[in-house]
Amino acid sequence: MEEYQHDNSTTPQRVSFLYSPISSSNKNDNTSDTNNNNNNNNSSNYGPGYNNTNNNNHHHQHMLFPHMSSLLPQTTENCFRSDHDQPNNNNNPSVKSEASSSRINHYSMLMRAIHNTQEANNNNNDNVSDVEAMKAKIIAHPHYSTLLQAYLDCQKIGAPPDVVDRITAARQDFEARQQRSTPSVSASSRDPELDQFMEAYCDMLVKYREELTRPIQEAMEFIRRIESQLSMLCQSPIHILNNPDGKSDNMGSSDEEQENNSGGETELPEIDPRAEDRELKNHLLKKYSGYLSSLKQELSKKKKKGKLPKEARQKLLTWWELHYKWPYPSESEKVALAESTGLDQKQINNWFINQRKRHWKPSEDMQFMVMDGLQHPHHAALYMDGHYMGDGPYRLGP
């Protein structure tokens, strides 16, 4: 016993292996520095002669896994105490077995967290691989070409010609690559659920294409009607739309018209309010051209008969001026006028009748003599005979 006590008195005190609380790491650094400077000071929470090597190792582990701090077990100062806080009559430091078990628990929790992280990454990779596998099944399905065609048909509706050409070329290129790379799918490896999905999706795309096509066709028909109406009004063909091949419909136009329209904008001529009447007239002329031409000729002949030659009219006007007081030619004078003018008796009679109605008004003496002649036919006869005897002024008989 004396030798054992002597050894204890000469041997320095051993270090306590108890762990400090995780939340007090900064405090541990300060206390470890103090213990290195003064090994005989017993005021430290970790006991005399505490070395800061363990504390530095724990601090390094926390720096490596900062996101795992919430998963580590929380300890308190009441769970782990230093040797000088416990009653010890012999003043010898006591070693507790909780240190080794706490170290094992710490590493087990850390490894469990790492394992959970790896499992989450593996699950994400599995999800990505599942999506890629499903895509490969859809592409290798026999109905995929039908599905692709229905989808591209929907994209072509209302698209410009260059876009339609690019879509068609892309589809042909894709089908060529699929025929070279995709193996044939056996009947045993087919998925009934995938087959049902492909059929339903193809039907949905076909119906969607029909719904898109209907308003486009109605709009095209409306524009064609507008074109025809504008063409009828303007007497020239007007084309609002272009052919599917991108060329203009106005193939028969001259080079000057094509150069004028090369700007891309269609200039509409001014609308004539009488264009509709002219269109109707042209239509009737085409339908009744023979009858109208004969009728026109007949009407022109009648007009020519009603209009006397200029020389004949001049001779009749000369006789009219000489006999203005009483412009009634006798039968002999009518014959003479007919021979000189080349007209017939009917034309001469009609000309004098119209001329007297329009340009002659008898004087009051003439009106009185005419009225008196109605009462005395003998005087009227003398007047008429004396009037036509010469071209000079005449007297009335008794």
Swiss-Prot record:
- Tell me one GO molecular function of this protein: DNA-binding transcription factor activity, RNA polymerase II-specific
| Top-level taxonomic group | Eukaryota
- Primary site of residence: nucleus
Segments for region (Disordered): 20-61, 78-102, 241-273
Q: What induces it?
A: Negatively regulated by ASYMMETRIC LEAVES1 (AS1) and ASYMMETRIC LEAVES2 (AS2).
Tissue distribution: Expressed in the vegetative meristem. Present in the base of flower primordia.
Q: What are the UniProt keywords, alphabetically? A: DNA-binding, Homeobox, Nucleus
Output one GO BP term: xylem and phloem pattern formation
Residues in coiled coil: none
Q: Which GO terms describe its cellular component?
A: nucleus
Which compartments is it annotated to reside in? Nucleus
Family assignment from sequence similarity = Belongs to the TALE/KNOX homeobox family.
Q: What is this protein called?
A: Homeobox protein knotted-1-like 1
As recorded in Swiss-Prot or TrEMBL, the protein's gene is named KNAT1
